[in-house]
């Protein structure tokens, strides 16, 4: 009884202690909000003219600055800029359905326009017909078009209700504003699409243009009559990086001067996040500052490019482009347990600086390349082809022919936007409305992919292809295991044979027949014999089930039947034309590089890889240089990075784009060379704190300064873990449990994304991601106030700082350096000291007001809680998640 009383007292003390600590944490959170409010007014917080640069601090702070935000109401501006992703959604998911199911009765070409409704134009849909407007943007439930598709009111199309998948596409389209790029009016049909040769002069389809005599070009730009001389801006001294020739010559033409270079600590943080996705450690900072000033920056670049964390950072960018995920999504959201092998292949390839042409070739046709002697390398070539398999698939689609062509359509969409920078999938149902791609072009490439096996079977719920990755070590394991199975089988057989003598000895059978077999089968067994036989059987079955399996990877292989595809009328696989299109690529693109002939017994993937990676190809190098530039500057040279077509934007610096692409190819397609060339330019190293030309060039199109950029979700989470010394930076296969690994290793479930993904603008992983948007929403501030990741990081780092020093000034300095990557100013130190004292006093006051708990109060606990609240406030500042 006495023992039970002691245990009860200990339990009550523990509850009081936990309650006290919880109270401290809650008060610390409230104080952190107050701290963030104070710090926000001081810590490098600037509101620019862009909505995307709002302060990400607690909601109360957002309220203080609300009056400073620009008017962002809809309808302002001289030209409507449609979201590219929504335009592509309309072109690939909405327009084809309208063409196939509605145009016959509701277009300008209809003999009789039924119900006075035209759906072949944007204005026709909005205007509607006899029953009124067909669409109410953002209100699907009020839109007659959706009601008709649902068969609630009128029933359209009359030949049969469309699938739930298509109807859901229309619901989504209307809910997101019914974006429609068509410009024709209801009484003026769109101009028929032109012949491909009419667009032959488009800049993106021309060969790369090498420049001769760069210094002369620079001089010509200086003396160009188009140069703006009104401000008498002198051209800066001859640059050492070729990139700066082009940028500074353009600035001179515009009458603009470049911004100054950013200071050393800003460059350290910028470069560390750009190349590794992680903040610099205190040790890295000290080494950087101790390097010779004239070599400091270049040495830092080399160290970061050599870090294995470089591969983890830049693989995430590529995975966005190729719609990487760990589950199928769509109708059957099955886990893709081996998708991670492709992800790890990308990380390893980037860390090894695999040439980009080889990087692309292996993904397109790695299984068809000459197999290397090294078995690991052979398996990597197979794994690389997972690129084709990663997309979402309608696994339960019972029309397997439709399922297959839809898979091919998704593959074409991802391939064309990622590798070619064009929207070829828009030509499935009709000739491309804007670009020189015909339906024949589409089905020429579709034939290559239809001749490639992506699906393992055509079952009720189909399965994607997975291929074995055999190794000699695993072969030996399997051989040894098979030997054990054979031995167990033989032992069991002998055990059964030995029962003959046992039965005779027991007198159960008076004699054996001449054949010595049949009576033994029918004779009785002793319990001991039964037990031995059962154990031997269990052992054998266990061995058989435990046969070591070969690793498997999502991958493709050549299909048994190679096919040339017929053009499908309006994209409908049930309406093939009589003419078959030879396997190949768009004809407009073979002007610069001829496409190799495809033998009848080959799919054409090998020829596709050879053609695409030819140094003379006009698109691949341009597209990738533009993307790398975008990920370093926050904006690309071509502002539509996945659409180099006629509706895409022209490059701001066309000579720079071509020159950099040509030199990259000459350097062996080395991505690390390309990174080094970009980040060592003056253009990259400029400060973002310059507002001289905000009015004349608000988007910084002419690169007169560096752009301020917000971190994506992954480096935000990784920084919280790294700052609190909790990050598990190991690369490689999945580990048991999620743990504090880098965010690239988080599970991406297409049907159930973690809330953390959506808070910071991670977009739909079911399709190619051109560029992540940057939005400002209240949930981001709430994330920093309430999310356990932030509170745990704050408490952990606060405890670490409290233990490392008893001097508050040293603790404040350490917190600033760990969280923000810089030393605090003297005024920031004074304000922070005041906050810490305020926090300690408040905690002590709360402790006195709390009924006695019987637990001795540790004053150091107040200081630790105050430092945790202080760190929480630093995490909540804008400076933490923005790269200057």
Placement of each model-derived feature along the sequence:
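Long, intrinsically disordered low-complexity tandem-repeat segments
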Residues: 27-51
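Bacterial N-terminal signal peptides
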Residues: 54-68
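Boundary at the C-terminal end of the N-terminal hydrophobic targeting segment
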Residues: 66, 70-77
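Active-site histidine-acidic residue metal-binding/catalytic motifs
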Residues: 75-77, 168, 179, 203, ...
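Solvent-exposed helix-loop boundary motif
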Residues: 75-171, 180-218, 239-244, 248-249, ...
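Primarily short, surface-exposed interaction patches in extracytoplasmic proteins
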Residues: 238-270, 274-309, 323-374, 407, ...
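Globin-like tetrapyrrole-binding proteins
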Residues: 870
């Amino acid at each position: 009884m006495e023992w039970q009383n002691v245990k009860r007292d200990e339990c009550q003390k523990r509850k009081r202690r936990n309650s006290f600590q919880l109270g401290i944490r809650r008060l610390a959170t409230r104080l952190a909000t107050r701290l963030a409010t104070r710090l926000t007014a001081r810590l490098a917080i600037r509101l620019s003219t862009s909505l995307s640069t709002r302060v990400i601090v607690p909601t109360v702070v957002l309220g203080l600055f609300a009056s400073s935000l620009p008017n962002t109401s809809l309808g302002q501006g001289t030209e409507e800029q449609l979201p590219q992703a929504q335009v592509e959604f309309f072109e690939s998911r909405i327009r084809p359905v309208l063409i196939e199911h509605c145009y016959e009765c509701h277009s300008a070409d209809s003999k009789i326009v039924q119900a006075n409704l035209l759906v072949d134009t944007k204005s026709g849909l909005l205007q509607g017909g006899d029953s009124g407007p067909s669409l109410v943007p953002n209100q699907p439930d009020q839109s007659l078009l959706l009601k008709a598709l649902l068969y609630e009111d009128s029933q359209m199309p009359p030949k049969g209700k469309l699938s739930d998948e298509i109807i859901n596409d229309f619901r989504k389209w209307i809910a997101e504003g019914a974006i429609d790029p068509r410009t024709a009016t209801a009484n003026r049909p769109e101009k028929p699409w032109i012949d491909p040769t009419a667009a032959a002069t488009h800049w993106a389809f021309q060969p790369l243009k090498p420049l001769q005599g760069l210094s002369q070009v620079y001089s010509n730009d200086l003396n160009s009559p188009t140069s703006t001389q009104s401000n008498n801006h002198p051209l800066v001294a001859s640059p050492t990086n070729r990139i700066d020739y082009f940028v500074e010559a353009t600035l001179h033409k515009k009458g603009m001067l470049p911004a100054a270079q950013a200071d050393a600590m800003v460059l350290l943080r910028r470069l560390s996040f750009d190349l590794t996705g992680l903040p610099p450690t205190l040790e890295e900072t000290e080494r950087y500052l101790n390097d010779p000033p004239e070599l400091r920056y270049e040495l830092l670049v080399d160290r970061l490019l050599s870090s294995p964390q470089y591969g983890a950072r830049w693989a995430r960018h590529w995975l966005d482009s190729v719609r990487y995920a760990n589950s199928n999504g769509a109708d059957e959201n099955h886990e893709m347990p081996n998708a991670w092998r492709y992800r790890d292949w990308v990380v390893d390839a980037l860390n090894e600086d695999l040439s980009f042409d080889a990087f692309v070739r292996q993904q397109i046709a790695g299984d068809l390349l000459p197999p290397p002697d090294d078995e690991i390398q052979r398996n990597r070539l197979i794994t690389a082809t997972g690129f084709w398999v990663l997309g979402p698939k309608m696994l339960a689609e019972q029309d397997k022919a439709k399922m297959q062509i839809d898979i091919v359509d998704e593959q074409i969409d991802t391939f064309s936007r990622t590798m070619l920078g064009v929207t070829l999938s828009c030509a499935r149902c009709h000739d491309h409305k804007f670009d020189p791609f015909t339906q024949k072009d589409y089905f020429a490439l579709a034939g290559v992919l239809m001749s490639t096996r992506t699906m393992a079977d055509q079952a009720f719920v189909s399965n994607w292809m997975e291929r074995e990755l055999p190794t000699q070590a695993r072969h030996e394991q399997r051989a040894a295991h098979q030997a054990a199975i054979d031995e167990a089988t033989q032992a069991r057989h002998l055990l059964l044979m030995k029962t003959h003598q046992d039965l005779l000895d027991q007198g159960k059978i008076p004699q054996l027949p001449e054949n010595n077999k049949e009576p033994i089968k029918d004779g009785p067994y002793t319990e001991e014999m039964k037990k031995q036989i059962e154990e031997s059987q269990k052992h054998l079955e266990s061995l058989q089930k435990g046969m070591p399996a070969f690793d498997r990877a999502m991958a493709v292989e050549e299909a048994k039947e190679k096919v040339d595809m017929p053009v499908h009328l309006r994209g409908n696989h049930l309406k093939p034309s009589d003419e078959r299109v030879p396997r190949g690529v768009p004809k407009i693109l073979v002007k610069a590089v001829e496409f190799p002939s495809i033998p009848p017994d080959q799919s054409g993937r090998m020829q596709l890889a050879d053609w695409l990676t030819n140094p003379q190809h006009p698109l691949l190098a341009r597209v990738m240089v533009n993307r790398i530039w975008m990920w370093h500057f926050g904006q690309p040279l071509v502002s539509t990075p996945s659409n180099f077509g006629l509706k895409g934007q022209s490059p701001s610096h066309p000579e720079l784009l071509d020159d950099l692409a040509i030199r990259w190819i000459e350097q062996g397609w080395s991505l690390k060379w390309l990174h080094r060339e970009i980040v060592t330019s003056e253009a990259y190293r400029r400060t973002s704190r310059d507002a001289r030309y905000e009015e004349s060039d608000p988007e910084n199109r002419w690169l007169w300064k560096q752009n301020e950029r917000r971190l994506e979700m992954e480096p935000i989470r990784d920084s919280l873990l790294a700052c609190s010394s909790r990050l598990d930076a190991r690369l490689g296969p999945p580990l048991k449990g999620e743990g504090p690994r880098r965010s690239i290793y988080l599970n991406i479930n297409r049907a159930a994304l973690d809330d953390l993904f959506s808070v910071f603008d991670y977009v739909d992983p079911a399709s190619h991601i051109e560029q992540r948007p940057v939005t400002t929403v209240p949930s981001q501030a709430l994330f920093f106030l309430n999310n356990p990741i932030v509170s745990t990081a704050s408490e952990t780092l606060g405890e670490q700082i409290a233990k490392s020093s008893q001097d508050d000034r040293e603790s404040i300095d350490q917190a600033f350096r760990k969280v923000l990557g810089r030393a605090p100013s003297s005024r920031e130190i004074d304000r922070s000291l005041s906050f810490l004292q305020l926090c300690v006093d408040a905690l002590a006051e709360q402790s006195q007001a709390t009924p006695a708990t019987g637990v001795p109060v540790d004053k150091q606990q107040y200081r630790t809680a105050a430092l945790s609240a202080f760190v929480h406030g630093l995490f909540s500042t804008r400076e933490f998640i923005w790269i200057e």
